[in-house]
Amino acid sequence: MKFGTKVQNYFQFIILNSQFLCTFAAMICKRHLLFVLILLNCLLAMGENAAERTKRDFQRLGLSFYECHDVRILPTGEIKFRDLFQTVEQARKYILMDYFKFQQDSICGALLDILRRKAREGVKVYILFDSFGNHDSDYPLSDTLQASIRRSGVEIAAFDPLRFPWINHLMHRDHHKIAVIDGEVVYTGGMNVADYYLHGKPKVGKWRDMHIRMSGSIVTAYEELFWKMWRKPPSNSPLKGENQRSATEGKANSLPLREGWGGSVAFASRWPRETPRIMRQTYQAAIDNAEHLVQIVNPYAMIFGEVRASLRRALERGVKVQFMVSTKSDGMANDDVIGLEMRKLMKRGAEVWYYNDGFHHSKVMMIDSQFCTVGTTNLDARSLCFDYEVNAFIFDPATTTALQQVFDDDVANHCTLLTPEVFRQRFPLRRRIRARIFTLAKRFM
């Protein structure tokens, strides 16, 4: 192989001056070590995809990663409760349930019948529900029913009971939806325990939601979260079950990053005074790392702050952003404020789809067909700034693709694309004025 004269001269210069060049490079590195490290970090990041960069960002945020052997998507209430009931029937050691609402209706009654029977069989059963969520329910658990449940051997407690005049307790509520069985399986997502997930509500029609079931070491994280909530002062009385905590409690909160069949899972738990910004930070990191596609389904998309800024940056980078919200929700103010936010996204280039087949209560996001999140977090002030929330960020293309298929099927069969004409039809002037008034209180909704 022959080189040109200029190339040969370059090689000769480098060989003759190699000692000087090495000394000069060492001086540069010594004086500008921080710059060199930043440059190397940027060069490494250029070779990573969105999932790898997001994992790195999550580790900096202090999130723990867990192994997941299996992820099952439960896209409807009927599928979720059938699967949950079957797993509860097979419980041998303990059952832990933490839900924002246990509505006193047919589906709750059927579940309680199974739990009472399992308690008689010697299985330890613990139920935690949010006190405010119970008062806000159409059919709250009565004191009489709770006493009956305790007599059957099931431990049941209300999280942070409301006591007048301490209304500050209204702000930090237990919004979890968690069921752990024998430390082997966890269910989580957007569904409470109520029969409207099967039969709908008169105001909105069908009530659509989504849950997931996971196994593997990720279950440990949810189990530890349950006991942390159970023990939180003011104490839930009586807590006779506190000495019956499972063997998994007390294990290290962070396990090595390992890839299971379902991929690694990052565990994000919002604790008002410990990790108040974690949901905003994780959503921001995920969206900021997206290269091609962001898909979000969320019922209360009153987006602001970090999440709104991240979506705008994604659109400016040329990332395709698809957002799905419901035509009808369970609050007039919610509909109006969400409408204004969706219009802003639409004007910046996002695809906004209005779901027409009832109320879509799911809380999911998919990034670049590489990873996704499913959990309890709404994109409103209550979830992002006040309540106790938990999300699983699942780094698995197969699970993400399956969620995308559900999204795409809904778009094809149950959705209307938001356009300027559609917005004007849905939001006449009077409603837009009302929405702007409601927006003033958005940070408390």
Walk through the language-model features, giving the residues of each.
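Sec-dependent N-terminal signal peptides
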Residues: 32-40
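Charged, low-complexity intrinsically disordered terminal segments
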Residues: 28, 43-445
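Short, basic/polar N-terminal leader/transit segment immediately after the initiator methionine
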Residues: 4, 29-31
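Cationic, amphipathic, low-complexity segments that mediate targeting or membrane/lipid association
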Residues: 4-8, 19
